[in-house]
């Protein structure tokens, strides 16, 4: 499948076939995409919880309550569900861990590169923590960068996907024990193969005209 074909053909699946499983090698490819997702100053303020078992999906489905009950089948019937989570803070331990990994991976060749990277990253963290006071929103933006790559990659692999903000984040955090780990859930993505009940598959894609959303200068 070409990139153009993937962009046009992908859609948010409304019903999954519970009998269909995504092959593990394709899941591994998607995990590699998430692992290598870009983030501002390589901050990597995320964690991904992958539910592949019936028990795991059931735990995540607990968050589809009340106004979000319509999303429960999309979680329970999927092959895999990934909870994209963010850190509650970019603390000293995390910043040191990222810096140490960069050094281990050979990122610092020039003299002073390590100190420069550390200083630059901290300046952005401090900017969002103190001046702009939007550190959680900034971290959340990085998670959505990962989401975009995941959805496009799934389409390229012929995997159907459903991104969901319609869930109770508090319930999911409790079900997965996220908060005691310094994490909170941001968005869910169900992966699998659509069923015949997926009405969205037969509907045309609808976007505003190109001349309304692009400006060339």
Q: Which positions does each model-derived feature cover?
A:
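Acidic, surface-exposed loops and disordered segments
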Residues: 1-217
């Amino acid at each position: 499948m070409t990139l153009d074909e993937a962009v046009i053909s992908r859609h948010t699946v409304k019903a999954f076939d519970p009998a269909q499983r995504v092959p593990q090698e394709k899941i591994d490819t998607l995990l590699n995409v998430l692992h290598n997702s870009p983030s501002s100053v390589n901050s990597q303020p995320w964690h991904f919880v992958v539910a592949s078992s019936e028990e795991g999906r059931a735990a995540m489905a607990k968050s589809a309550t009340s106004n979000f009950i319509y999303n429960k089948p999309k979680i329970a019937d999927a092959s895999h569900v990934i909870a994209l989570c963010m850190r509650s803070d970019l603390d000293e331990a995390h910043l040191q861990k990222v810096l140490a990994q960069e050094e281990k991976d050979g990122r610092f060749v020039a003299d002073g590169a390590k100190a420069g990277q550390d200083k630059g990253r901290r300046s952005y963290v401090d900017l969002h923590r103190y001046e702009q006071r939007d550190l959680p929103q900034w971290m959340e933006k990085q998670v959505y960068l990962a989401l975009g790559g995941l959805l496009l990659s799934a389409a390229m692999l012929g995997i159907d996907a459903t991104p969901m903000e319609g869930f109770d984040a508090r319930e999911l955090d409790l079900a997965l024990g996220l908060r005691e780990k310094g994490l909170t859930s941001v968005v869910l993505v169900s992966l699998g193969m659509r069923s015949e009940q997926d009405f969205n598959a037969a509907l045309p894609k609808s976007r505003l005209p190109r001349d309304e959303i692009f400006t060339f200068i």
